[in-house]
Structures are given as C-alpha cells and as structure tokens.
Amino acid sequence: MTPHINAPAGAFADVVLMPGDPLRAKYIAETFLENAQEVTNVRNMLGYTGTYKGRKISVMGHGMGIPSCSIYAKELITEYGVKKIIRVGSCGAVNMDVKIRDVIIGLGACTDSKVNRIRFKDNDFAAIADFGMARAAVQAAKNKGIDVKVGNLFSADLFYTPDLEMFDVMEKYGILGVEMEAAGIYGVAAEFKAKALTICTVSDHIRTHEQTSAEERQLTFNEMIEIALESVLLEDSL
C-alpha cells in the first residue's frame, strides 16, 4: 500500500491502462475486461484488475495534470511492479490536418512543465514513448481498420492558458494534440526503467472550435481502448 493506492501487493497486472477520469477506468473495466475486481479506491481514484482475452490487465485513473499522473505512475511502477503504462485520454487539436474524432498515438511529448528539467538537471529531456509499444499500437489499429495519426503531443500545465500565441508555435512544429499528462508519464517511466505510451482521441479542435458530442466521444473512446488492449496482446506475441 501507498499513501495514494490501497491495493495489496500483487493486485495489479504488469500492464496498466490509465485514463484521467476514474469513472472511465470503471467503464473500461466493466466493458472490456472479464472478472474485473476493484483493487484500489483512495480519493475515489478507482483501479481494477481483470483479464482481456485471457491476458491479465489493470486499469486505473490518474487524475488531471502531470503532478497527479506522476504520483500514480511512480507508485504503480516502484511499489507494484508495473512494467508498462498506456495512457488513454482525450486531447485538443491545433493542426488543421488533424480532425475531431481522430486517434493519435503520441511518439513524444513536448511540455511547458518543468518536471522533466527538474529530474534531468535542468537540461531538456526527450520525453518519448516506448518504440515497441507504439509499433504494436499502430499495428493493432491497422488490424482493426482504424486510421491513426502518429507524432508529437504537447502536455500543458494550464488548461485555461493565457498564451494563445503558443498554439501557432505548436502548429508550426507539427504538434498533433494538446493534453496534460504524456510528458510526465514518459518522464516517470524513463526514470524508473518502465515503458509507457499515450493514445488520445481528439475531442475538440482549438482552431475550428468543433467539439464532439458525448455519443461521439464514447465511440472514439472505445476504438482507442480496443487499440490499447489489442496492442498488449500483439506485443506479447513478438
């Protein structure tokens, strides 16, 4: 047990899917996993373990922002032996080549947060996904006939940013989506010798102001979860 996770030793699988919303974790467990059992509920940050096509997998919420997700990712890795984390969440698009409802596989994550500079002696740290996990996710999407975008995300510290000109810079540099956690999770994974990947669905477009409905978000969310789960099986088979 930790100050933030009250699961017993051995409660988590070696692979954990992590949405921001703990109720999304509950939904994933109830919809996609067999024999799912709740294993932690401190602060209502729900976590579950079950099986997917016979493969033991866990799912747990990580909250909003790099500080929150970093706490849970670190404790899962160092205290529960988790080897791989797949963040599954939503993002906003700033590039006109990216459309709402697109699924993005985040190979890397830029950020305006200082967390990785703090851990990397004030130098730039290349916060990147594990190649094998990313490759398996791309293949899983192809197998299911789901088009995905692959590239860089931007993990913002502020949801309500006053610096709107930064969106122009992001677009210039080909950023596919803006979210709030990937760079932190990639940094934690690197520091503690684990592996991580972020998969996002585009829920809104910052340029066009388009937004998905609740029903549309659910559909694309399901596709993202299917990609994540199938990628675990694919990588196991390699």
From Swiss-Prot:
The keyword Transmembrane does not apply. The keyword Transferase applies. A purine D-ribonucleoside binds at residues 4, 179-181, 203-204. GO terms for molecular function: purine-nucleoside phosphorylase activity. Keywords: Glycosyltransferase, Transferase. Pfam families: PNP_UDP_1. GO terms for biological process: purine nucleoside catabolic process. Catalyzes the reversible phosphorolytic breakdown of the N-glycosidic bond in the beta-(deoxy)ribonucleoside molecules, with the formation of the corresponding free purine bases and pentose-1-phosphate. Belongs to the PNP/UDP phosphorylase family. Homohexamer; trimer of homodimers. This is Purine nucleoside phosphorylase DeoD-type. It comes from Histophilus somni (strain 2336) (Haemophilus somnus). The lineage of its organism: Bacteria, Pseudomonadati, Pseudomonadota, Gammaproteobacteria, Pasteurellales.
